[in-house]
């Protein structure tokens, strides 16, 4: 299944089969990616047209909404999914299907203009970056969209994106569209069907971007494997204080400790957790307490300003904890998961076998063996020879670290 649907598509299908809540959607196969490079963009659109539109109609029926409708719109995300995990190498587009008319319709439907225009400005930014080529190649280069956001925040006198007013968010949408026109000479597409095809083809193109090619060389992944494209109905973590988004691991990827851990943000979308725009909060209480201790934050301040999900959303935390345990037992390995909470309902967007350090690799393999989840042969095969080198290098003693004087710290 992974060979055809890619890792992400296969895991979404599998999660659905075992009763884990995933949003409805469809996956375009890895073979299509290779065909894209053989026959070109226009021919691929022609070949896929009927199947993609039928799959969109099926998703519409399941979500009871319509793609491109003003009264009851369906928005989708478009994500890449190679056979082997390639974290952060390829591109994702969220909130696809928005235009000025759909945004106005969504405001009437939800009564939440801040959420709608926050989603809209994110979409224009992602689409401009990924599909229309405005994403900076190097980290040192200035992202034109981020420069615009900083200017608007300064004008409004706020420091966080989430504190921007509805008027400022509307202004961002217009400024982003103007930046796209100025830099590419093309207008931002307003037809949702055109947006969808642009995103699908951009994911296929991202298989051959510089980062992805370099990563494949390092990991020994063949070019001909191609990437699948997963199109999924949007669920929103930025609909208010009962919505959230996060990433989590069934065990500690750093040291292998059998401790569920991760980070989440209330009233945010997926990219925010890893983008460094806001400080994410810990999922478990123990993780939150450890983080606060390292950061020199008192327990009172931690509880008031940075509560864990276990404390802030106890019922959802229980559900998340039970499902992550279910997934680890299903895959017999440590899982790296992404989730969204939309108005109190939990959805899983992804699971994969988590990347880990050499120390964690050995500990997790031995723990899973002792827990009866894997056999000895599997435990040995889980230990990558090149990572064993990490175990031969000196590391800090935890006790010594706790007594050390902190000179400075990063994110």
Roles of regions detected by a PLM:
Residues 409-411:
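Long, structured protein-protein interaction/assembly regions in large complexes
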Residues 1-406:
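Nucleotide/phosphate-binding sheet-loop regions of phosphoryl- and nucleotidyl-transfer enzymes
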């Amino acid at each position: 299944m992974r060979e055809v649907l890619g890792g992400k598509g296969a895991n979404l299908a599998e999660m659905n089969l075992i009763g884990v809540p995933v949003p409805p959607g469809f996956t375009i196969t890895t073979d299509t990616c290779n065909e894209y490079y053989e026959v070109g963009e226009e021919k691929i659109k022609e070949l896929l047209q009927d199947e993609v539109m039928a799959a969109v109609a099926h998703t519409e029926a399941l979500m009871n909404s319509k793609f491109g409708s003003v009264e009851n719109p369906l928005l989708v995300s478009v994500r890449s999914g190679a056979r082997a995990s390639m974290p952060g190498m390829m591109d994702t587009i969220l909130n696809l299907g928005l235009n000025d008319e759909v945004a106005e319709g969504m405001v009437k439907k939800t009564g939440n203009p801040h959420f709608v225009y926050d989603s809209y400005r994110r979409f224009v930014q992602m689409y401009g970056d990924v599909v229309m080529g405005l994403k900076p190649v190097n980290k040192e280069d200035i992202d034109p969209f981020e420069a615009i956001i900083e200017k608007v925040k300064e004008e409004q006198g706020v420091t966080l994106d989430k504190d921007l007013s509805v008027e400022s968010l509307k202004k961002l949408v217009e400024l982003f569209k103007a930046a796209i026109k100025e830099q590419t000479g093309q207008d931002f597409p307003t037809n949702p069907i055109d947006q969808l095809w642009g995103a699908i083809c951009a994911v296929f193109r991202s298989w051959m971007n510089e980062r992805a090619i370099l990563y494949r060389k390092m990991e020994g992944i063949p070019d001909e494997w191609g990437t699948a494209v997963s199109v999924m109905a949007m669920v929103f973590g930025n609909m208010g204080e009962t919505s959230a988004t996060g990433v989590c691991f069934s065990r500690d990827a750093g040291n292998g400790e059998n401790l569920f851990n991760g980070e989440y943000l209330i009233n945010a979308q997926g990219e925010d957790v890893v983008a460094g725009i806001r400080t994410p909060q810990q999922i478990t209480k123990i993780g939150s307490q450890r983080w606060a201790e390292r950061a020199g934050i008192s327990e009172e301040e931690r509880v008031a300003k940075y509560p864990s999900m276990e404390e802030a959303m106890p019922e959802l935390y229980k559900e998340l904890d039970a499902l992550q345990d279910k997934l680890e037992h299903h895959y017999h390995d440590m899982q790296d998961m992404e989730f969204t909470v939309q108005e109190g309902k939990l959805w899983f967007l992804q699971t994969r076998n988590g990347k880990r350090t050499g120390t964690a690799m050995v500990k997790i393999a031995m723990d899973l063996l002792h827990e009866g989840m894997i056999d000895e042969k599997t435990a040995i095969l889980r230990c990558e020879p090149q990572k064993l080198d990490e175990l031969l290098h000196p590391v800090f003693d935890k006790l010594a670290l706790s007594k050390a004087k902190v000179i400075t710290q990063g994110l």
